[in-house]
Amino acid sequence: MKLNLTRPLIVFDLETTGLDFIRDRIIQISYIKVSPDGTEERENIFVNPEKPIPHEVVELTGITDDDVKDAPTFKTLAPQLSEKFKGCDFAGYNSNHFDIPMLAEEFLRAGIDFDFSKVRLIDAQTIFHKMERRNLAAAYKFYCGRKMEDDFTAHRADEDTEATYRVLMGELDKLSLIHI
C-alpha cells in the first residue's frame, strides 16, 4: 500500500542509554524517509553517547560501548539530521511519548532549534490502541480463544468476575508467570 503523503515522512526509532530525557543519550537512530512520490531512503546510525552504555541496555539492545566508540556524537550529527528532517512529518511506535521528546532534547543539547510543533507526529502505538478494542471481551477472546458472549452475559458483575478470572489464568499461562 502506498502512503498518501503531502510531505516527506520520517519513520524512525531510537535506542538510548536509558529512559531519562535529560540524563540519557541516543546510541542508535534508524529511519526511513518516505517521499510523497513513494521513494524511500533508509539510514541506520550508531551514535557515541559520550558515556558508558548501562549493562541492562546492552542486554536489551545488543549495542555495546565498542559498537559506538568510533561513532559520531549526536552534536556532530545534529546539523545533517536537522537538514534531512526539515519539512518532514514523523512516525514511530510509542514515538510521541519517548522518541520525539528524546530526539528534541538531543537537538536542544546540540544547539539546534528543531521545532516539532510544526510537523505532524504519527504514533503507530496510539493508532493501534484506538483501533484494537481494549476491553474485557477483547482480552477474553485473546487469552481464552473464545468470544465472551458465547460464555457469559456481559455487564453482570458475577459473570464479568468469572471472565476476568479466566483472562488472568490465560495471561499467566501464556506469559508463564508463577507468582503475582
Predicted regions and their residues:
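Short alpha-helix plus adjacent loop in nuclease-associated cores
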Residues: L121-N135
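Conserved non-catalytic scaffold segment of RNase H-like nuclease domains
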Residues: M1-K118, R133-H155
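Conserved small/polar residues in nucleotide/adenosyl-binding loops
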Residues: I178-I180
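Active-site phosphate/pyrophosphate-handling residues
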Residues: P101, Q125, E162
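Acidic, divalent-metal-coordinating active-site segment for phosphoryl/phosphodiester hydrolysis
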Residues: R156-V167
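Generic alpha-helical structural context detector
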Residues: T126-H129, K141, R166-M169
